[in-house]
Regions:
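Short hydrophobic core segments
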Residues: 17, 35-55, 63-64, 112-117, ...
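Glycine-rich phosphate/pyrophosphate-binding beta-alpha loops
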Residues: 50-51, 79-80, 115, 119-122, ...
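N-terminal Rossmann-like dinucleotide/flavin-binding domain of flavoprotein oxidoreductases
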Residues: 1-10
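An anion/pyrophosphate-binding glycine-rich loop and adjacent beta-alpha core
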Residues: 68-74, 78-194
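Short loop/edge segments at beta-strand edges and connector loops
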Residues: 11-15, 31, 72-74, 214
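A conserved short coil-to-beta-strand element within the FAD-binding core of flavoproteins
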Residues: 13-26
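A glycine-rich dinucleotide-binding beta-alpha-beta segment and adjacent secondary-structure elements
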Residues: 13, 177-254
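A conserved FAD-binding loop/helix module that cradles the flavin
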Residues: 47-66, 253-276
Length: 276
């Protein structure tokens, strides 16, 4: 704000944009109680993620008004929901464990969290940006475990049941749920080696079939948005509308967790700011 004051920036808070027009090389923005004009206009209103903070799709409407293409927006970095076929796992709400979550060629080793609606946690949020409706995701519940670790468990704890063996890798409630699905209900010593090999393979790529996401309400960012093909990669200026710029989450750029989306917003804003 100090820098804004030095640059004699005028802030208009609590104002709605009623109309934007462009004529004779200048933009005309109609607000609730005034009209602002200028040679440049920066679209910096973000995407529709987290609407309770006031987020809308205004950036896309404005971009389309000026002939810019918009890639269909969708929630990203968002929890996934599970259907009735996987209700057993929805009962694990609150259980978290380290996993490798995969979708196609994307793999993330971080924590996964079971919720009353499905799956969340960093690993799931990351993979959600790559997930498309109808696709499965795979979860490795024993990341880093050496091949044959269940056979080793059979040697080291022969009288144990499968839930106890799985409980050395994941929380007890999750171990019980996984064991129920695998359905090997005898002591490890009485299980054929191949059954344990098969169980280990299943645990390394457990399929889940999300039936959706928790939507823009829970999405940290938005995938899709103003097509980058229509913008200068150096200045963020629209190639077909001199003086019009687009930055931040309203543009079709999506980063991983860890501050990358903030960095994109700041970097793209600075790029545009050099030329406004």
């Amino acid at each position: 704000l100090d820098e804004c004051a030095k640059g004699e920036v005028e802030l208009q808070l609590g104002q709605s944009i009623r109309k934007v027009a462009h004529a004779d090389g200048r933009f005309r923005v109609t607000l609730d109680n005034r009209i602002a004009t200028g040679a440049a206009l920066v679209i910096a209103t973000g995407g529709p993620s987290i609407p309770k903070m006031g987020a809308t799709g205004f950036a896309y409407d404005l971009a389309r008004q000026f002939g810019l293409k918009v890639v269909e927006p969708r929630p990203a970095l968002v929890p996934l929901t599970l259907g009735p076929d996987e209700a057993l796992f929805r009962s694990l709400s609150g259980v978290a464990t380290e996993v490798v979550a995969s979708c196609g060629k994307a793999h993330f080793r971080e924590a996964a969290l079971f919720t009353h609606k499905g799956l969340s946690g960093p690993a799931i949020l990351q993979v959600s940006s790559y997930w498309q409706p109808g696709e499965p995701i795979a979860i490795d519940f024993a990341p880093g475990r050496p091949k044959g670790w269940l056979l080793d468990a059979k040697k080291n704890m022969p009288r144990a049941m499968l839930p106890a063996a799985l409980g050395t890798v994941v929380p007890a409630r999750l171990a019980a749920a996984l064991a129920e699905r695998i359905d090997l209900k005898v002591e490890l010593a009485n299980l054929p080696n191949q059954a344990l090999v098969d169980a280990e393979s299943r645990l390394a790529a457990w399929p889940f079939h999300p039936n959706g996401t928790q939507g823009f309400e829970k999405a940290e960012v938005t995938a899709g948005g103003i097509n980058t093909d229509g913008l200068s990669s150096q200045t963020m200026e629209a190639k077909t509308v001199p003086g019009l710029y687009a930055i931040g989450d309203g543009v079709d750029v999506t980063g991983w967790l860890g501050g990358y989306n903030f960095q994109w917003a700041w970097a793209s804003g600075r790029a545009a700011g050099q030329f406004v």
